[in-house]
């Protein structure tokens, strides 16, 4: 058991043969943590990353939908406004600074997310609106469901397992832990501390 920046990880080999990595993400109290993003980084993974053909984060009911979007580096994201009021979407995050001034409908050009990192979004008109685009430099990423579980399929090798949640303090980087995958099925439990409910 090893604790590193609030990340606790247990790794167990289950059987021989190629199989996926199953992650169980928990909060500090050991409860399943829905909506956590987990991803595996390595030099080899970086060479495999490809932008998505299509991605969008809409605005509906004066909220970003979905509130968290995970995309590989280089992905162009549309921001359709499905409300009857105008929105002014912006980000001042170092990974991507941009502004889509007052609009209804879909802007003519999508926003290309060309650097990895956490991009916090807001609406200059509706201050309560907040969303996140997590830009990853790997094809091996997933978001946990209500049960706190996610499955990653990656070839054997040495990786950095990174975990992020929107409940982490603003500006907090993804937590990370070294991890070696074999050709056996593996299960890991990730415990994230510092996540607000």
Predicted regions and their residues:
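Sec-dependent signal peptide recognition
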Residues: 2-10
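N-terminal signal peptide c-region/cleavage motif recognized by signal peptidases
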Residues: 13-16
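Extracytoplasmic copper-binding redox domains, predominantly the cupredoxin/blue-copper superfamily
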Residues: 18-197
């Amino acid at each position: 058991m090893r604790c590193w920046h609030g990340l606790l990880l247990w790794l167990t080999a289950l059987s021989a043969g190629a199989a996926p990595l199953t992650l169980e993400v928990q909060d500090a109290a050991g409860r399943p943590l829905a909506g956590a993003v987990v991803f595996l980084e390595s030099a080899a993974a970086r060479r495999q990353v490809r932008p998505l053909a299509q991605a969008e984060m809409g605005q509906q009911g004066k909220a970003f939908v979905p509130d968290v979007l995970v995309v590989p580096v280089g992905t162009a994201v549309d921001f359709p406004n499905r409300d009857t009021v105008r929105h002014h979407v912006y980000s001042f995050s170092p990974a991507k600074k941009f502004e889509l001034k007052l609009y209804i409908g879909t802007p003519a050009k999508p926003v290309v997310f060309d650097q990895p990192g956490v991009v916090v979004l807001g609406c200059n008109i509706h201050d309560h609106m907040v969303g996140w685009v997590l830009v990853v430099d790997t094809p091996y990423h997933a978001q946990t469901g209500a049960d706190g579980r996610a499955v990653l399929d990656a070839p054997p090798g040495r990786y950095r397992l990174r975990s992020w949640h929107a409940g982490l303090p603003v500006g907090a980087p993804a937590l990370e832990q070294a991890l070696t995958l074999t050709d056996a099925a593996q299960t890991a439990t990730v415990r994230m501390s510092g996540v607000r409910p």
